Amino acid sequence: MELASPRLIRLDFEDLTAFERVNDQYRHMGIRFSGAIAIEPSNPGFRAKSGSTVLIPMGNLMSLSAYFDKPSCWAGAFVCSTRIVVLTAYDREGNFLGQTSTVANQPSLPDGQSESSPQQLELNRHGIAKVEFHSYVPFTLDDFFFALMP
């Protein structure tokens, strides 16, 4: 019996334009987003992991979601925030599969600003249909990655 290897996908969002609402742009890869907008951060405290374009939650929302056409077995991203960011995974029926979070990251800079380094958040669970990134303060999301079984 031959085991099927998952297809690994990484999105760096460099093909998006600033202030573009992100929904179905990656549907051909089996994923769609909700509540996300692309930006090029001007605040050096929220730098991108790679490139210059990141996602942030739209409006006053402090969460954004990704939905998989086929269940994923691994999903995550690099997030940048001055407070904790939580990643939660759900199955097709909306059942909780798992959760992980960053650590608070608040080094002080001489001018009183805060700077955050991108932190990797990931969950490895079978049957992930939706992931949600949430915080109580603004955050950026970059280099989103996931694995799909063939």
Description of each model-found segment:
Residues 1-150:
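Surface-exposed, well-ordered secondary-structure segments
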